[in-house]
Design a protein with these regions (language model features):
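N-terminal signal-anchor/start-transfer transmembrane helix
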Residues: 9-32, 117
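Transmembrane helix-loop-helix hairpins at the membrane interface
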Residues: 98-216
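Juxtamembrane helix-loop-helix connectors linking adjacent transmembrane helices
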Residues: 27-116, 129-131, 210-215
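Cytoplasmic membrane-interface regions of multi-pass membrane proteins
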Residues: 22-37, 124, 175-178
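Hydrophobic membrane-targeting alpha-helices
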Residues: 19-23, 59, 63, 169, ...
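Short, Lys/Arg-rich N-terminal segment immediately upstream of the first membrane anchor
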Residues: 1, 39-42, 189
C-alpha cells in the first residue's frame, strides 16, 4: 500500500467517523423532532426547481473544468471520485467495495442531511436580508469555494456557487413571506437546500445500485 493509498484510507475513516457522529446526533430524541419538522415542511416549491438548478451547476462545472488547473482537487489527487463524503475512490474500482463503501457512507449521510443543510444555511445565508447584492454574490461564491476545501475539483466548487445563489434567493423569499424573521428565512433556505441534497443522494443511490448490478 502506497502513501497515497494510506492517505485516502485515512480521509475516508475521518469522514466516516464524522458522518456517524452527526447521524447519531440527528437521531437523538431532542433533535429528531426538529429534523422531522424540517423534512415535513418541504413543499413543491423546494423540489421543483432542483433539477434545473442542478443542470445549471453541472453545465457550469463541465465548462469550468475545461480550464487548466480548475480540474484539480486534493481528493481526486488521492484517487477519489467527487467528494470524500460519497466514499468513492479508484482504488476500489472493479471490487465489491466500489459500491459497498459509498452505500455505507450514504446510509450514514441520510439522517445527517437536514442538520448539515441547516448548518450551511446558518453559516452562509443568515443575515442576507441586510447584505447588498454584491455581498450576497460573494457569499454564494464562498459557499461554492468551501467545497474545494472538502476535496472536490476547483471548477466544480466554483459551479456550486450557483446553488449558493439559489439558496440565497430562497432565504430572501422566506424572509419576505415569514414576517421578516431570520428563523423563517433559514427554514425556507434549509428546506430548499435539503431537497437539493436529497435529489443528489437519490441520483447517487441509483448509480450505486446500477454499479452493484453490473458487478454482480
Amino acid at each position: 500500500m502506497t502513501l497515497v493509498d494510506l492517505l485516502a484510507v485515512a480521509v475516508l475513516a475521518a469522514v466516516g467517523t464524522r458522518l456517524f457522529s452527526i447521524a447519531r446526533f440527528s437521531l437523538r430524541p431532542g433533535r429528531r423532532a426538529h429534523v422531522v419538522g424540517l423534512i415535513r415542511g418541504i413543499r413543491a416549491r423546494h423540489v421543483v426547481p432542483v433539477p434545473f438548478v442542478l443542470a445549471a451547476v453541472l453545465a457550469a462545472a463541465l465548462l469550468l473544468m475545461e480550464v487548466p488547473g480548475l480540474d484539480w482537487g486534493w481528493w481526486t489527487a488521492l484517487g477519489g471520485f467527487g467528494n470524500p463524503v460519497t466514499g468513492g475512490t479508484e482504488r476500489t474500482v472493479g471490487t465489491v467495495f466500489e459500491w459497498l463503501v459509498p452505500l455505507l457512507f450514504v446510509a450514514l449521510l441520510l439522517p445527517a442531511l437536514p442538520l448539515l443543510a441547516e448548518r450551511e444555511e446558518q453559516v452562509f445565508r443568515r443575515g442576507d436580508e441586510r447584505r447588498s447584492i454584491p455581498q450576497r454574490a460573494a457569499r454564494g461564491l464562498a459557499f461554492g469555494l468551501v467545497h474545494a476545501v472538502m476535496g472536490i475539483p476547483l471548477g466544480a466548487a466554483l459551479a456550486l456557487s450557483i446553488g449558493g445563489w439559489y439558496f440565497s434567493w430562497c432565504y430572501l423569499r422566506g424572509y419576505r413571506n415569514g414576517n421578516r424573521t431570520q428563523l423563517a428565512a433559514l427554514a425556507e433556505s434549509t428546506r430548499a437546500h435539503l431537497a437539493y441534497n436529497a435529489f443528489i443522494v437519490a441520483l447517487l443511490v441509483v448509480s450505486l445500485i446500477a454499479t452493484a448490478g453490473m458487478s454482480g
